[in-house]
Each structure stands twice: as C-alpha cells, then as structure tokens.
Amino acid sequence: IMKKLKYLMMAAVCVLFASCMGDSYAEPAETGSAPYGNNELTETNVISIAQLKSKFANYIATDYRDGVSYAKVTDDIKIKAIVTSSDVAGNIYQELALQDATGAIIVSVAQGGLHGALPIGTEVLVSLKDLYVGNYGKQAQIGVPSVNAAGATTIGRISRAVWDQHYKILSTGNKVEPTEFASGTNATTWNLDTDGGKLGVIRNVSFKSSNNSKVTDTFADANGGAGSVSWTLNEQDGKKVIVYNSNFAKFANNKVPTGKVDIVGIFKRFNNQWEIVIRSLDDIKPAEKVDPFKGLPGKGDGTQANPLDIT
C-alpha cells in the first residue's frame, strides 16, 4: 500500500509540475517561432549592407586614434542577411559575419557559442536602432562603444541581452557560396571597403611561414595563451594577405598542409591587409586541378594517349 501511495504522489507531483510549466513552455513548438532572438521584429525599413556602410562611411574609415570611429544608429532601420561565420572550432570569437547580395559586415557580440543559435546559413533580420556602426581596423562592424586597453573608446561587443532583442531568425539552411578572392599568384580584384568581411575562397596556394618563430609547422600555438598566429602564403604578398589563426582554435596545434590548397574563409579587413579566417579545418581542401582544356570544343583530354581533337 505504501509503495502504491508513493507512486500516486509522484504522479500527482508530475501533473502539478507540468501544469505549472503552462502553455508558454510548449509555445515555441506550437507557434513554430524561433526560440532565440526577438520574434516581434518586422521586415520594415530594410536597407542593404552596402547602403548601411555608405551611410556610416566616414566612421568606418576613421582610425580611432584619429577621431570618432563609430556612430549611433538613430533611425529605425534594419538589415537582412545570412550568417556565414561559425565559432564552432574556436577560431572566430564573439562575433558574427553577416552577408547579403551587396556585401558583408561583422557583428560584435559578448557571447560564446553563437553557432548554437545562429549556425552558418541562418537568415536574420537585424534591428539597428540604438546600436552603433563603426570599424575595427577599418573593417565595418556593428557593436556598442567600448573602452580598449589603451583607454580609448572604440566599437566593442554588444551584450547578450541587448543582442537578443535586436535580431530575428527568418530562415535556416541557406547556402552562401564563397566568391573567388584570387587564384595562385594572381592579385585579387576585391575592394577592402566594399568586400571586407565576405565569405571567399583563395585557390591553388600554399603556406609559407608564420609570424611567430616558435610556430614553424602548426596553425597556431595552443600553449601561447591569448593571441594568434598569422601565416603568409607563397603565392601572395604577405603584407597584403595572411591566414589568421587563433591560439584558442581547436586546430591550433594541427600541422598546416604542405601542398597546394584551396582555402575558404571570412576575408576580413585589418587596415590595408586581408585576413583569411577559416571557420574549421573543413575550409581547407587540396587544390582542385585546373583543366586547361575545359570548355574547349572537341574530344580527348590533351594527353599523348588521348590527344585533343578539335576537328
């Protein structure tokens, strides 16, 4: 009897607990609305990323040491863009790269594990009113004013609570194809002002050397503490293009490839240099072999055994 009574009491507690949770507990599943962000936002006053950057061009172009490098958004304007970054491997920290058809911008957020709520391919609506637009190393960025180590006020990270009120998830699983930045020794045609922050791919390149004498064959230094390691590429000018790797990246102590590779990543601007930031090791693949006869009429593959015949 005591055992029966015990089970009856447990069942009653479970029913009471479930009723206390109320309808709101099940609401996301019932309404289909996203469990993160602000679902009250509506798609009104939407402008492109290019228009936003044009509107705040002077602040984006100003070094914080030379003047004010950010400004508050006072208008009720929004952008609609797709997440192209991921912090899943630890190489990207507390920021999102957002991209639309006109360009890209970085959002600085004081939150780890952003890939959980906002994985690659998530389309978001971002309400910009009361946030700030400025730059970090001339890279366009959305954030809030923050005092840096030197005591200067620059654009910094939005708190998690504030950020949660400023975005709405519109859809997931969207595909963003990387645009070719360059191939081999060819110079890029990308523009630092308009293309900074975009998802790109550099093809047929190889790792040359790092800026850390202790790091000779790994991506970064996992025991080096806060900081990063920059690798130059044999085929590109190291003053213009580097591969950025955080010491906190999960792949920091992995060996860099020795052969030719294609590298996908977020191509961020840092002053007058391009920083390629990979999201995980999946962004680096052996270089695709270029077929010089691709697209030409005729038969054959151009080898001695099977010469090209265009007759």
Give each language-model segment a name.
Residues 1-9:
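Bacterial N-terminal signal peptides that target proteins for export
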Residues 16-19:
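C-terminal motif of bacterial Sec signal peptides marking the signal peptidase cleavage site
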Residues 21-93, 97-309:
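OB-fold nucleic-acid-binding modules
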